[in-house]
Amino acid sequence: MKKLVNLVSGGADSATVLAIAQKMGYEIYAMSFNYGQRNNAELRKVRELVKEYNVKQHKIVNIDLRAFSGSALTDNNISVPHYHDVNELPDDVPVTYVPARNTIFLSYALGFAEVIGAKDIFIGVHTSDSANYPDCRPEYIKSFEEMANLATNMGVQGKKITIHTPLIDMTKEQIIRTGLELGVDYKNTISCYEPTEDDLSCGTCLACMIRLDAFKKNDIQDPIKYV
């Protein structure tokens, strides 16, 4: 059975990617990060989420991206923006962008992949995020894959490493629809940037607004609880 490293955050996108990877028949090695994020709820959710899939091993890596701050997700001095309507959402890079986060996460995944002999890495970046987050763009993923094959022993031996982005051409609406078709139970996910201590989602941050809109367009109620 082919092995893969699957980056898993505990959000709806991650759950969908896990379901896709399982359907494709991979032996899944999941990797998550405790990086000093404001949303600790995602780590609690991800532990439950991976139990629903045939995950061979789940690693939670501790790193502290608060060391250089620069994001509302890692710096409590920067407020998370809240909105009243999905049409208010920004078109540019928001303060919730964590500098170089996907590069850091993919680098860890790459190292893990080499150790276990996996030539495939899955990450849940997609079209809906590409305008707001530069490290979610297809050209970024392509460049990282090229670097991965130049910078690793596997790559120079001709064992090509592939960064898979199964959601890349999907909107959030399509991602939720795909997950529902694959039987994903989204109640064990959380997308909120600023949930309460008892894991209630705020419903008004960028991530919540996009998620709620996607469920609405699929004519189904989001199963998680909101404030």
Curated annotation (Swiss-Prot):
Database matches in CDD domains: QueC-like
Sites where the protein binds Zn(2+): C192, C202, C205, C208
Protein name: 7-cyano-7-deazaguanine synthase
Cofactor note: Binds 1 zinc ion per subunit.
HAMAP family per UniProt: QueC
A molecular function (GO) term: ATP binding
Protein family membership: Belongs to the QueC family.
Keywords, alphabetical: ATP-binding, Ligase, Metal-binding, Nucleotide-binding, Queuosine biosynthesis, Zinc
Gene3D superfamilies xrefs: HUPs
Required co-factors: Zn(2+)
Residues where ATP binds: V8, S9, G10, G11, A12, D13, S14, A15, T16, V17, L18
GO biological process: queuosine biosynthetic process
EC number of the protein: 6.3.4.20
Gene: queC
Catalytic activities: 7-carboxy-7-deazaguanine + NH4(+) + ATP = 7-cyano-7-deazaguanine + ADP + phosphate + H2O + H(+)
Pathways per UniProt: Purine metabolism; 7-cyano-7-deazaguanine biosynthesis
Function, in words: Catalyzes the ATP-dependent conversion of 7-carboxy-7-deazaguanine (CDG) to 7-cyano-7-deazaguanine (preQ(0)).
